[in-house]
């Protein structure tokens, strides 16, 4: 629970009651909240004064117990990163597009925090050197699955296949009215994030 101190208070009463420095779950009631990124870390709730969002957070927080496995969505090769050379700053594309603020400058290359990274994939799609690549699933695994789908479609007598890539947030719409409007040759392929598809996949 995040509560800001008033101007006259040296420290918020809520802060004074804290017995540890790290938490798995945070309900930030500040407006604006302490964290401003578009994609907040898992377990961080910021209703921003929205009563419905606050109700959802209060309902979900007690259910978030136990452990979960967070995948590592990326591979990073700092040797080919074009972020900087000899003290001269270069490419900042991944820094500019990451909605989770998981990427930071580390001098002549960037570094990615695997705990903040949520697999949006825009960094891998926009990286000019391939220093950041998407790893969950890998391009090879994705293309292998797509080939299997296409072969099965062809063997069943299908023609002129149309691949429709969509993310998990669109799954409900695809299964409903939106999917019903697709032509017969459309084959939906669900991804963690559409941004994870780069030119290497489009041109394969």
Task: Name what the model sees in each region.
Residues 134-155:
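A contiguous, basic/glycine-rich beta-loop/short-helix subdomain that forms a polymer-engagement track
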Residues 195-203:
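A short, acidic, amphipathic alpha-helical segment used as a generic capping/interface helix at domain edges
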Residues 13, 105, 148-151:
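Glycine-rich, charged/polar anion/phosphate-binding loops
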Residues 74, 89-113, 118, 122-140:
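Iron-sulfur cluster-binding cysteine motifs and their immediate structural context
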Residues 177-187:
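Short helix-loop-beta junction
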Residues 1-97, 101, 154-176, 189-192, ...:
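Ferredoxin-type iron-sulfur electron-transfer modules and their immediate structural context
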